[in-house]
C-alpha cells in the first residue's frame, strides 16, 4: 500500500498498486482529525495522462473503419512519431513518489508502441501503476 500525505491541502491518500484500491481521507483539522470535508485538490496529480502514441497502426491501415469504428483522432491520416522511451522515462522520473498511476494514451493503441513492454516495466519498477485502454485489435496470445 502506497501512502501519500498532502500537508498543504491536509489529507491522506493511499493506493494499492496490486489491486488498484484507492482511498483518501477528508480534510483534517489542525488537531489531525478528519473533518469529513472532501479535499478539493492535491499538490501533485495522483493520476496523470501521458500521450505516448503519435500514430495509430490500425487507423492508418483502415482496420478501424472496416470494423465500424469512427476515429476521433483522425488515425487514418495522421502520422507523428511515438514518444521515445527516453522521454517517457524522464516523465516517470519526475513523477515517482508523487503520483500513483499513469494513464497511457495518445493517438492509437498503446499496446502497439515499439517499447510497450519497457514502458510497463519502468512504471512498475518506480511504483507507478500503468493503465491503458485498447481496441484489442492488436492483441495476441502472448
Residue ranges of predicted features:
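Short glycine-rich loop/turn motifs that provide flexible caps or phosphate-binding loops at active sites
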Residues: 19, 104-107
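Residue-level recognition of conserved structural "scaffold" positions that shape functional pockets
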Residues: 27, 33, 58, 113-115
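Canonical Radical SAM [4Fe-4S] cluster-binding loop centered on the CxxxCxxC motif
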Residues: 39-86
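Hydrophobic faces of well-ordered beta-strands that scaffold small-molecule active sites
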Residues: 48-50, 100-104, 130-132
Amino acid at each position: 500500500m502506497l501512502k501519500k500525505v498532502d500537508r498543504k491541502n491536509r489529507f491522506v491518500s493511499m493506493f494499492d498498486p496490486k489491486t488498484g484500491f484507492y482511498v483518501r481521507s477528508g480534510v483534517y483539522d489542525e488537531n489531525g482529525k478528519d473533518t469529513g470535508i472532501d479535499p478539493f485538490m492535491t499538490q501533485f496529480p495522483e493520476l496523470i495522462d501521458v500521450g505516448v502514441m503519435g500514430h495509430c497502426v490500425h487507423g492508418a491501415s483502415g482496420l478501424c473503419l472496416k470494423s465500424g469504428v469512427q476515429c476521433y483522432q483522425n488515425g487514418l491520416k495522421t502520422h507523428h512519431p511515438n514518444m521515445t522511451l527516453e522521454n517517457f522515462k524522464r516523465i516517470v522520473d519526475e513523477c515517482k513518489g508523487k503520483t500513483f498511476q499513469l494513464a497511457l494514451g495518445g493517438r492509437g493503441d498503446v499496446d502497439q508502441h515499439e517499447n510497450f513492454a519497457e514502458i510497463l516495466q519502468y512504471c512498475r519498477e518506480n511504483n507507478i501503476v500503468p493503465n491503458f485502454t485498447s481496441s484489442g485489435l492488436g492483441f495476441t496470445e502472448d
